[in-house]
Amino acid sequence: MVDIDGTICTQIRPKPDDPNHKPHKERIEKLNKLYDEGHEIHYWTARGSGSGKDWRAFTKKQLEDWGVKATSIHCGKPLYDIWVDDKAINDKTFFDVNNDSIENR
């Protein structure tokens, strides 16, 4: 499960369609490599959770334009202050570690 804003692209609030929204290409490449190796990569974003706007079509096209490979793309992730999960990995930690440690999870 991978977040979008602030994880694979710059975090710009409140509008995901801001033209200054830029992909983190090296992060996308790492996730695409995992996808190519057979891992399921599901993207889940809170886009629209606060505003009620449907960002699905825009988000799908944006990820396609950035070359993102995905098993699925979902909008409507709940807004929260902290995420606690036994499989959670902070994005900065994930992108600084070797994929071998992730594959064994």
Regions found by a protein language model. Give the residues of each.
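Catalytic phosphate/metal-binding cores of nucleic-acid and nucleotide-processing enzymes, i.e., regions
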Residues: 1-105
